[in-house]
Swiss-Prot record:
The keyword Hydrolase does not apply. Belongs to the bacterial solute-binding protein 1 family. WtpA subfamily. GO terms for molecular function: molybdate ion binding; tungstate binding. NCBIfam families: PRK04168.1, tungstate_WtpA. PROSITE patterns: PROKAR_LIPOPROTEIN (PS51257). InterPro entries: ABC_trnspt_W-bd_WtpA (IPR022498), ModA/WtpA (IPR050682). This is Uncharacterized solute-binding protein MmarC7_0925. Keywords: Signal.
């Protein structure tokens, strides 16, 4: 017997029977009986906060087994849109991947939940770590023997944001050779300068790098271990991830770190095209987004998990990612979330 039936057959006798049988609230019944799996595809940089959200949810709903798969956000989306995999939650390090790659066929709403910025992390094993600053990092990177790392732009927002940061650095530092020296000379990336002063970075479907200078992996969290063991010297990474792993880092100017809304116009002068996916992405402030995919096996469970996330923004804050609270929502947001969001 569910709530709809109770509204139709609203007699005192039936209500009493149901009350004694523990069936007044169907969701409460589900929370204590039927075993369920809740699958999440999330960005690698969300691993720490989403581990906490997993614990919170399983504590509240012991019958639910939360299963998380961490990958680059582009790869997460493609699991759903190209590989026909299903999940109750899709959480991306770039909210725009949801409207650009999933809507309208695989999602019809999303919420923007937290922010971040790009920093450069290092260890005491990094060459010239005692000399590097926010003003000279690009010069340090050009020294013989210095090796820097970033994730693949084709798989991971942190990867294409790295390309944006380095290109934006040319204007911020007044040096038009920075991208050329760090990227063009050490990879098969290309860049177009447009007549209006904007730039388009081209990321080929197969990326080749000079492994004597560049260390690249699919997603940014795959680079943490090699950095800590000295496989390379410096890593472009989210500030939250650097904090979570107790890494030293230098902050970058607001004009290039993609973390400041006041500099959105500066960021918008650079974009990147992922040629293998025919997808063009404009540089913009870093905002994380999540949705329940339309093809989720248990859509309502996904909405329930999203509600729990929105009710606990402190989890993001404690993980070093400033929360957006209330979250900003776009599209046909489920009624259960309406009191926790503002419509964008």
């Amino acid at each position: 017997m569910n709530k709809k039936s109770l509204n139709i057959v609203a007699t005192l006798g039936i209500l009493l029977v149901l009350a004694f049988s523990g069936c007044v609230d169907q969701s409460a019944s589900d929370s204590t009986s039927e075993e369920k799996v809740l699958k999440i595809f999330h960005a690698g940089s969300l691993a720490v906060p989403f581990l906490e959200y997993e614990t919170l949810y399983e504590d509240e709903y012991p019958n639910v087994d939360v299963q998380r798969e961490s990958a680059g956000s582009v790869a997460c989306v493609r699991k759903i849109t190209e590989l026909n995999k299903t999940a109750e939650i899709l959480a991306s390090a770039d909210y725009t991947l949801i409207p650009d790659m999933m809507m309208p066929d695989y999602a019809d709403w999303y919420v923007m939940v937290s922010k971040n910025e790009i920093v450069i992390a290092y260890t005491e094993n990094s060459q010239y770590y005692d000399e590097i600053t926010s003003d000279n990092w690009y010069e340090i990177f050009q020294r013989d023997g210095v090796k820097y790392g970033f994730s693949s732009p084709n798989d991971d927002p942190c990867g294409y944001r790295t390309q944006m940061v380095v290109q934006l650095a040319e204007t911020a530092y007044g040096d038009s050779t920075i991208y050329d020296n760090l990227m063009l000379k050490n990879s098969n990336f290309m860049v177009d300068e447009n007549a209006d002063g904007t730039y388009l970075v081209r990321s080929p479907s197969t990326i080749d790098v000079n492994e004597d200078k560049v260390f690249m992996r699919s997603k940014e969290v795959d680079l943490l271990g090699p950095l800590e063991t000295g496989a390379f010297d410096y890593l472009f990474i989210y500030k939250s991830v650097a904090n979570q792993h107790n890494l030293s880092f230098i902050e970058l100017p607001d004009e290039i770190n993609l973390g400041n809304y006041a500099n959105a116009d500066d960021y918008a002068t650079t974009s990147i095209i992922l040629e293998g996916q025919n997808s063009t992405i404009l540089a913009k402030p870093i905002v994380y987004g999540m949705t329940v995919p339309s093809n989720a096996d248990d859509y309502e469970e996904g909405v329930s998990f999203t509600k729990m996330v929105l009710e606990h923004p402190e989890v993001f804050e404690n993980s070093g990612q400033p929360a957006i609270s209330p979250a900003i929502a776009i599209g046909n947001v489920p009624e259960e979330l309406s009191d926790l969001v503002v419509m964008g």
